[in-house]
Amino acid sequence: VQASLLNVTEDEIGDPLHILSGSDISDLGTVSLGEALDSLVGVSSADYGSAVGQPIIRGLSGSRVKILNNGLVKRDVAGIGADHKNEVDLNDIQQIEVVRGPSSLLYANGVTGGIINIVDNTIAMEDVVDRVFKLGLETQSVNSGDAQSFSVKDNLGGLNVYFSYSDASFGNYDVPSGAILHEEEHDEDDDDHEDGDHDDHHDDDKGYLENSDSAQEAIRFGVSKVADWGYV
């Protein structure tokens, strides 16, 4: 059975687990965590400009949605306010695993909405066969932002070595003229004073979303040894 609106099968709709590959994330460019997952069924994003996008799973967010990195809980300030971003590095990752609903209790306690696990390539679980270099450059006009990224992985003397660096800086999100709606205040006792305040208020339009700027720098380095017994 396939839903015509969603173009997915019934089994896919009922499955609480979804895996998004690293190549799919790379095709999106520099995006927030919420925006990267926004296309998944049951997942949406609470955005604040282009840099901030907190994921919402089945209508739940904040402490009800737990963010993990390689299985370890990420502790940042994203839960303090809507204008705080999730401190995760989506540059050159392996995959993102999303578990929706009560099934997430199998992997983390105190979670009712779901969990999101970012799996990166810092610790290789298989031997690196060929040396791989990746370089990324990006610019965004809506916030005068730019981003650069670099990563390399290789096998040196039987050890798998990985290094990556990313740097992103985005200004305040531009807002088109006239897009801001003002709540008018009426004072029957002083109409003249109100008219003056009205003009001053609209003169203060700044043309951008305040506090939507962001900057992030991330460095990852890892070494692993793979053998028949596993990896370390």
Predicted regions: what they are:
Residues V73-P102:
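Short acidic/polar hinge/loop motifs at secondary-structure boundaries
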Residues V1-S26, G34, G62, D120:
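Short, acidic, small-residue-rich periplasmic hinge/interaction motif at the N-terminus
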Residues V129-D130, K134-G136, Q140, A147, ...:
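Periplasmic-side early beta-strands and strand-to-turn transitions of outer-membrane beta-barrels
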Residues Y48-S50, N86, N109, S141-G145, ...:
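Transmembrane beta-barrel outer-membrane domains
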Residues L33-A36, G53-I56, L68, D83-V88, ...:
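N-terminal periplasmic accessory domains that precede
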Residues L17, G34-D76, Q94:
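Extracytoplasmic beta-strand/coil segments of soluble accessory domains associated
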Residues L6-V8, R64, K74-R75, P102-L106, ...:
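Short beta-strands and strand-coil junctions in structured, solvent-facing domains, enriched
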Residues Q2-L5, G59-S61, N69-G71, R100, ...:
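Flexible glycine-/small-residue-rich
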